[in-house]
């Protein structure tokens, strides 16, 4: 005779047991703590999203925008605060989205682990789908800002689109798609994207045209920005090698990585010394940050890589700001094209 199922009961055919409907919820509550994300307040969630962006690295975006705007002001006498703000938000959005893409693909490929600097997904601070959605939002925000810049600026659409989408593609393809980072081309992508390209973008939207000389002025800043990435890749050399990826630091080894880091660190100071000697003494302002550079060199030499990328980013920010101030304070006509 068929068994009668009481209301609120489920029959477990395999086990031959009867389970109350409420038992399922009870079982979920009995899951191991590590398998369930703890309940967090909205403030904690917002903090998690902000930390996932790696805000300490944003100097690599802000200083090129400031430099390009300063070059526009000194060469053409134009500086629209609306364009400056829109450009800064657009570049920061693309940079932040690129960091999230990096987090997602490094986790997907098994590169990030419990000892990694970025443990956003490893420690389940955010879920992969959260990172993807946030990245899409930031790329969308960047495109909205680019449209806003086109509305305000006299720069041709094709020129604005070429620079902006060139930077956007670089930020995504660094680890997404082709994954330039994994085939030792990431340094080149970052050197171009967060150096000449970002400076040119900020300059062009202000003056409404392209020029070559902003690319030249971007060189010291680009070298300093590359030092951030190289210190990061040198720190992660062993874990990257175990994961089967190839970075420039892995290709050249520890000794040449140390030499390259010093070159990226100190070559900008040589450039500033030449400019201060032959053009304007105001370009000596960035030399005030040289004690920080020597401190970073000692830290790299002793292989104390903890927080080295963050400290290098701090130097990059101060170096860039003093560089911008030096250009603004230089007498008219003392610098080439300014």
From Swiss-Prot:
Reactions catalysed: menadiol + (2E,6E,10E)-geranylgeranyl diphosphate = menaquinol-4 + diphosphate; all-trans-decaprenyl diphosphate + 4-hydroxybenzoate = 4-hydroxy-3-(all-trans-decaprenyl)benzoate + diphosphate
Pfam families in the cross-refs: UbiA
Region Disordered, residue ranges: 1-39
Record membrane topology: Multi-pass membrane protein
Enzyme kind, highest EC tier: transferase
Keywords tagged on the record: Acetylation, Endoplasmic reticulum, Golgi apparatus, Membrane, Menaquinone biosynthesis, Mitochondrion, Prenyltransferase, Transferase, Transmembrane, Transmembrane helix, Ubiquinone biosynthesis
Compositionally biased tracts (Polar residues): 15-24
Segments crossing the lipid bilayer: 83-103, 134-154, 160-180, 188-208, 209-229, 245-267, 277-297, 315-335
Database matches in PANTHER family: 1,4-DIHYDROXY-2-NAPHTHOATE OCTAPRENYLTRANSFERASE (PTHR13929), UBIA PRENYLTRANSFERASE DOMAIN-CONTAINING PROTEIN 1 (PTHR13929:SF0)
Protein name: UbiA prenyltransferase domain-containing protein 1
Lineage, broadest ranks: Eukaryota, Metazoa, Chordata, Craniata, Vertebrata
């Amino acid at each position: 005779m068929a068994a009668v199922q009481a209301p609120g009961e489920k029959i477990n055919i395999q086990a031959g047991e009867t389970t109350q409907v409420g038992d399922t919820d009870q079982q979920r509550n009995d899951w191991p703590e590590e398998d369930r994300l703890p309940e967090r307040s909205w403030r904690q969630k917002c903090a998690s999203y902000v930390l996932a962006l790696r805000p300490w690295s944003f100097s690599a975006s802000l200083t090129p925008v400031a430099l390009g705007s300063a070059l526009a002001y000194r060469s053409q006498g134009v500086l629209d605060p609306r364009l400056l703000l829109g450009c800064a938000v657009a570049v920061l959005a693309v940079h932040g989205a690129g960091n999230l893409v990096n987090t997602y693909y490094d986790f997907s490929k098994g590169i990030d682990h419990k000892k990694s600097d970025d443990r956003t997904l490893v420690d389940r601070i955010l879920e992969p789908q959260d990172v993807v959605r946030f990245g899409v939002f930031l790329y969308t925000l960047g495109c909205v800002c680019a449209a806003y810049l086109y509305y305000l600026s006299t720069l041709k659409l094709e020129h604005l689109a070429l620079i902006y989408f060139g930077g956007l593609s670089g930020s995504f393809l660094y680890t997404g798609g082709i994954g330039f980072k994994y085939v030792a081309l990431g340094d080149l992508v970052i050197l171009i994207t967060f150096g000449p390209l970002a400076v040119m973008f900020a300059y062009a939207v202000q003056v409404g045209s392209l020029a070559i000389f902003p690319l030249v002025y971007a060189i010291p800043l680009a070298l300093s920005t590359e030092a951030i990435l190289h210190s990061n890749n040198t720190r992660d050399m062993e874990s990257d090698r175990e994961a089967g990826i190839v970075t420039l630091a892995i290709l050249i080894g520890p000794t040449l990585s140390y030499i390259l880091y010093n070159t990226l660190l100190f070559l900008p100071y040589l450039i500033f010394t030449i400019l201060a000697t032959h053009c304007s003494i105001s370009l000596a302002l960035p030399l005030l940050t040289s004690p920080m550079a020597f401190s970073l060199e000692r830290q790299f030499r002793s292989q104390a890589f903890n927080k080295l990328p963050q400290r290098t980013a701090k130097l990059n920010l101060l170096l860039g700001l003093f560089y911008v101030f030096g250009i603004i304070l230089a007498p008219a006509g003392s610098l080439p094209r300014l």
